[in-house]
Amino acid sequence: MSANASCYDKSTGRLVGSNKSVTSVLVSPGGLYRAYAESEAAASQSPNTANPECQNTSKLFVSGPNSDDFRPVLVVKPSPEALGNNIDLIDWSPDGNRLLLAQGVWQWGSDAGGIIVRIYDAESEKLSRESLVDEAFSRYIGKNCAGVFYPVGFSSSGQVVLTAGPFFEEGEDKPVEDSCVRKKGFWLLDTVLPAVSQLPETYIVERYAKVLH
């Protein structure tokens, strides 16, 4: 489920104004925790440029067993290099304590951007660091590792399942020199070590959370 808002018309690319996107609520197994995400796209005419700009602010909200009130646990703000952003809610872990999400950042009007895999631990109220997946793959390869990573779910034992693929620079046919994944496939991430191991191509991802529409 994605909170993804744009100031532009999809078919024409014309600026149509500010917009907001809110996901449904994702409930953890056992029902103790709930989460939703929102993204707000604000259109503004920058005084220094002839072109209007679109800037996103995306937020993740979580409520716990002691309160029905949702509180923001992650706020992704625009930066000069990446005015666009969004949050994808992927799933809650089988034990119901950890939320897997994808934090997207990009620059409007270009192919520049990326996905950051994050895990929110509802018990400790902490988010995993942005570099966790890069660190795990670099450790596995034994050198700096560039790749395209996207979270897809949890294994039955509670480890993170993600897809990893080669990393290409914009307009290039060959992956960058640091690209360490030859072809797209499923990988298992141990967030404690951190470490990764490859999964079979036929791996089937289970779903554990409930969606409230």
PLM features: residue spans?
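Sequence signature of WD/YWTD-type beta-propeller architectures
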Residues: 1-93, 97-213
